[in-house]
Amino acid sequence: MKNSYKWDLSVLLNNQSLQANFLKIQTVSEALIKAYNNGLCFTNKTSFEQFLAIDDKFTELENRYTNYLYNKQNENNLDKEVNDAIFAYQSFKNNHNLAFSTLQQELYNHEKLIKDYLTDPKLAVYKRNLMLVFRDKPHQLSSQTQSLLSQINPCFNQAERIFNILSTADLNLQPVVYQNKKYPINSVSDYQSLLENTNRGIRKACYEKWIEIYWTNRNSLSLSLVENYIQLENFAKLKNHPSYIAQTAFNDEIEVGFIDFVYQQVAQFAKTFQAFIRLKKQIYKHVLKVNKVEPYDLTLTLFKTKKSYTIEQAKQDALKVLDLLGDNYIKIVKKAFNENWIDWLADKNKYTGAYSISNVKGLEHFFILMNFDKTKSSLNTLVHELGHSVHSWYASQHQSQNIDPTIFYAEIASIANELLLCYYELQLYKNNHKQLIASLLSQINHFFGATTRQIMFSQFEKDTLYLIRVNQKPDFKTLIKIYANTAVKYQGFKPEVVANKLKKTQYQKSLSHIIAIPHFYAGNFYVYKYAIGQVAGILVAKKINSGDKKMKDNYFKFLSSGSSLAPLETIKLLGIDLTSPQPWQEAHNEVKRWLKIVKQSFKKLQK
């Protein structure tokens, strides 16, 4: 009998063993190498079509097999059979890739012929991906440079390896001591748990230790980050891009100026951010009955319900929340529940957090990993991840090649679902001031976390990269000064206030997390894109919630498009042009409306 709270990954193997699936991939790999024929497949249309067909088959088999392996590993990272299979697959894939080391150059060599082939309507689905390859031609390395880089490849990414050690194994995890009682700390999450303790003294003691976790290694972490940026800048210039940021903008099919435009729009949220922080502190001061609200007070969840929340309740609530999206959307959500797409429960060796799978070409099930914690926060996680999975379902139904959305707009579908939950709770809690305040405080927090905070991170990256381009090598003090100054532009703090705070060691410690953000090592300058997902997601949910049929129709066009269009063009399917100030202002106005509701509810709560 199936466990309804476990995902059923076995469907990915088509009722065959791991070994049989691996053998099938190896067989198709051999056929693909033979069809490639060292690039001769591009010399005539028939062999080109055969190569594409076998490549499609290989991709689909590989997606099924790797999704099975890596998700089984995340289910239990000590599964020896799975870990051995992953090792064998990685060895195979390295050899497979070697057989196609000349692929890009052969595509360039046969560009004119291939463009002629693509005029055939039967091959139109391959056009976007191949045109993106040709677009990148001026930025490809010469064969001599490529050969040299492959020889010295082991020297690369040392900064990231050092960072991974310094930010995990070498973390300064000190036990928290309060009133002679020691609270052992084995991971960063242990600090986070204590920061939610109802005892204020424990929270204060925890906060003082928590802000020191990167402090001991601050100089090494700073050096690691700067070396990482130096490498990224140098690689971008090797590929004929003026800078690392310009390279990533090119890859996203946008102008560099669009990133600055996003910064300008988010900077206009500063006054509202200040108003939110003031109101939030007033609420915490009232509820906690303290004279002054400290940072370690704001980590506490207000108005926590003691009721245990079940998976079955979460399922029913998710269906209610997403009902506005229509019968077909609900039908897919029910498929996710009934066909075991979701691995619900936490387990000892399981990956922490939540995600919806990617690389979905050839799949019919779009799996979700969760760690359900029996609280309503898991409902937010559930609708978020369902947003991703249903997005994958629609894209798979309408696209044969460009299915997985890019990170540029991938969060829109999940944020829209979170906002539909917010609007549902606005109605549900209209007579419950405590829960209404808690719901909206959480949502406004998310908004500023994804816009203001992430843009501060992005501005920090940009300003640091600028110093590197003018041959300066910033140290820890310079880095935290850069980061602190972003609070002037995006959070509305006065420059002199920030300058005075920077003189205090405690404040410097509280800023040291900026040198320990894994996203900065990703190599694609992407944290500003969280603001895009947040703003577009708000507008989608707001309009669908108000019964806007045009937005609903546009939304399903968006979900169905996958990655078949350039990122900004994909978002325009929603009727949203993010190169214009209007959508940014509209989202901002909606947040101001939420803030007004919180103020009104707080006044009633005080009576």
Swiss-Prot record:
The keyword Nucleus does not apply. Binds 1 zinc ion. The gene is pepF. It holds the Pfam family Peptidase_M3_N. Zn(2+) binds at H384, H388, H391. One of its GO terms (molecular function) is metal ion binding. This is Oligoendopeptidase F homolog. Its cofactor is Zn(2+). Belongs to the peptidase M3B family. Keywords: Hydrolase, Metal-binding, Metalloprotease, Protease, Zinc.
